[in-house]
Amino acid sequence: MAQRQFFGLTYNFYGQPAPLFDLNDLQELAGCYARPWTSRFSHLAISTGSLPVWSARYPSVASRNIIVNTLLGAHLNPFAGGQVTSHQGITWRDPVLSSLAPVPAIQPPPVWAVAENVPLDSNNYPTYVLNLSSMWPINQDVHIMTMWALSDQGPIYHLEVPVDPMPAATTAALMAYIGVPIAHLAQTAYRFAGQLPQSPDSTMVSTIRWLSAIWFGSLTGRLNRSRTCNGFYFEFAKPALNPDQAVLKWNDGARAAPPAAAQSSYMRCISPHWQHQIVEVAGALMSQSVTAVTGLPALIDEATLPAWSQGVANLTGNGQGVVPCLDYNPVPMAAARHLQWRQDGLITAAQEAQLNNDYTAYALTIERHLTAMLVANPIAAGRMPIQPFNAADFGQAGQTAAAVALAQAMFV
């Protein structure tokens, strides 16, 4: 049975007095006469090659998601124990929050004095559970917004690998996706999770959960064509050609053994590179499409999270039973991936060095692009297409080594 409640958190204002979007965003992303739900995926077409591409008002791969999150957070007061309200002359068209519309001329709803970091609980709005089928997409987008809002770095996502082997039905389902890029797989997962109330133990949920783990195992290099998960792995393009691409592959060769114990962890990219990497944004969205259906398996350890994410009911905490959130940087992660490829005999030492040089150059291009776009889009102007960062953030190693070790424990 589908879960009948959810919990969430609205987006941070990053020191500004109001949500960071404008009326043009309402028209371009959600539309005052269209549903704002399940509208996250056009951003994945921004970067299709090895170089970042300027796209006017949405200058990074993550920009549209960031704006959608800030926009939704400004209109979710019913889930914070309040009424259906308006903000900037816009309100919900009906009680099931199907679409946004201009405030009606007669008896307009009260204006909400919007706030950042507002805890949300579907139990506060009884209309949700009474109209679960029609309002289900709200659960998905609130969940994704929350997993981004809890972090001041990259979005948080969950990974797990059980001790039991992959079910036969899941293996059969995965076969249909061989040759499909990560962006398309994430889009499939997002559309599946948001269409109707889903059962947490369905074959499709299992398929997406395994896809997320296989993607992460391949990101670290642990999974490759010489060591697969039941035959599956993601193949990454050469950095000099298109480093922002990963395609599901299958190989009838050596396979990783199940872990000695079930593995579970929350993850996030700690350096700003994630904002302009399809593999990072798509990988996170794919995993979040699972936990939108199943709910979080445990509280997220708040140890490395920002102050506004401390002790958020049903989401974060500390002490016994919490699951850690490992931070990683894609540059040393790529180096670990290339090292594993060499150790597995897939490339030579000279090729490893060249791959590392190419990836470092690619990462520097992203750094320069995002830095320029942050200057060109100051949040003091009232809009946040680029999430704020400091120059030193690009060099943070975080817990990359621990993340790699986790993949090794997942796929023995």
UniProtKB/Swiss-Prot annotation:
Q: Does the keyword Repeat apply?
A: no
UniProt KW keywords:
Capsid protein, Intermediate capsid protein, Virion
First-listed, main subcellular location of the protein, grouped into a coarse class? virion
What Pfam families would the database entry show?
Sigma_1_2
Mind telling me which residue stretches traverse the membrane in this protein? none
Record's subcellular location:
Virion
- Gene Ontology CC, one term: viral intermediate capsid
Q: Spell out the subunit comment.
A: Interacts with capsid proteins VP3, VP5 and VP7.
Family, as annotated:
Belongs to the reoviridae clamp protein family.
Q: What does this protein do?
A: Located at the interface of the incomplete T=13 outer capsid and the pseudo T=2 inner capsid, 120 VP6 subunits clamp and stabilizes the inner capsid shell.
- Provide the protein name: Clamp protein VP6
